Curated annotation (Swiss-Prot):
Organism: Thermosipho melanesiensis (strain DSM 12029 / CIP 104789 / BI429)
Essential cofactor(s): FAD
Matches recorded under PROSITE patterns: FAD_PCMH
Location in the cell: Cytoplasm
Domain (FAD-binding PCMH-type): residue spans on this chain: 27-188
Enzyme Commission number(s) of this protein: 1.3.1.98
SUPFAM superfamilies in alphabetical order: FAD-binding/transporter-associated domain-like, Uridine diphospho-N-Acetylenolpyruvylglucosamine reductase, MurB, C-terminal domain
Protein name: UDP-N-acetylenolpyruvoylglucosamine reductase
Length: 292
């Protein structure tokens, strides 16, 4: 109780045994020890200093927690949503959604984020995994990231981040906690930017099963020119079900929660797809989502 009192005195919201299904887009997941919501970056830093055994959660759009109790703490960045312009850079707190960044940039006439519109994640999560869509990657726009390494706050420039396809230094070094992300500014025309964003969203709605809970595309593209969704469709798994989990009939690269799926249903589906793809194509798949 002393720890909880300390967290509350810092100004956090604190929830005991909070179910993760309430906080992730898959709508799956059992309880964690403590679920903590800081309201400012300073509060976030102070909270990190009094907690151990912590996972950081952004918008929860790329995470599959297990069904059972998870004996660790989760800090949510959902309230860390500041955004402003300084020295020709858009600076965003890590919990800001990509959607809000895109809308802010479009309103200000800043181009370069159009293809990110509709990616259902936070700015911090996008930097963490170098999120992307339609040929665009987060790394293209990043100038710097402010991180906490457990001792001090550091500013890393883009050359230090080891960006590659769905990967970065932050995935390799979990001790680096993302606080803020600085994006470069490319001047454009608001009308044209909004028009392009509308086209991107239409494409998403047409091709992706947005009407069902999911964590987006489950698997990384293993090599250039190999499209996982098409490969899954070719081996006849489109629409295949395990428990409440199903390979989307709209886009086979998505596993959806169509009927109160358990985490184990999704995990079993992932392993089945990996096995079938390897047997049919000799390709080893890696997951794009984080499995807790």
């Amino acid at each position: 109780m002393k720890l909880i009192d300390t967290l509350l005195k810092l100004g956090n919201d604190v929830h005991i045994n909070e179910k993760m299904k309430c906080h992730v887009s898959f709508k799956i997941g059992g309880p964690v020890r403590l679920f903590i919501i800081p309201y400012t970056v300073d509060m976030f830093l102070e909270t990190l200093n009094v907690l151990d055994n912590v996972k950081i959660l952004g918008n929860g759009t790329n995470v599959l927690p297990k069904d059972e109790y998870m004996d660790f703490n989760v800090i949510s960045t959902e309230k860390l949503t500041g955004i402003f312009v300084e020295n020709d850079t858009i600076i965003c707190e890590s919990g800001l959604s990509l959607k809000k960044l895109c809308l802010y940039a479009a309103k200000e006439g800043f181009s370069g984020f159009e293809n990110a519109y509709g990616i259902p994640g936070s700015v911090g999560g996008a930097a963490y995994m170098n999120a992307g869509a339609f040929g665009w990657e987060t790394a293209e726009m990043i100038e710097f990231v402010d991180v906490y390494d457990g001792k001090k706050v550091l500013r890393l420039d883009r050359t230090e981040m080891k960006f590659s396809y769905r990967n970065s230094i932050f995935k390799e070094n979990e001790d680096l906690i993302i606080l803020r992300v600085g994006f470069r500014i490319i001047k454009g025309d608001s009308y044209n930017i909004f028009s392009r964003m509308k086209q991107v969203m239409i494409k998403r709605v047409e091709k992706q099963p947005l009407e069902f809970p999911s964590a987006g595309s489950v698997f990384k593209r293993p090599r250039k020119g190999f499209y996982v969704g098409s490969a899954i469709e070719k081996i006849g798994l489109k629409g295949f079900r395990i428990g409440g989990a199903m390979i989307s009939e709209k886009h086979a690269g998505f596993i959806i929660n169509y009927n109160n799926a358990k985490s184990s249903d999704v995990k079993d589906m992932i392993e089945l797809v990996k096995d079938k793809i390897y047997k049919n194509f000799g390709v080893k798949l890696e997951t794009e989502i984080e499995i807790w």
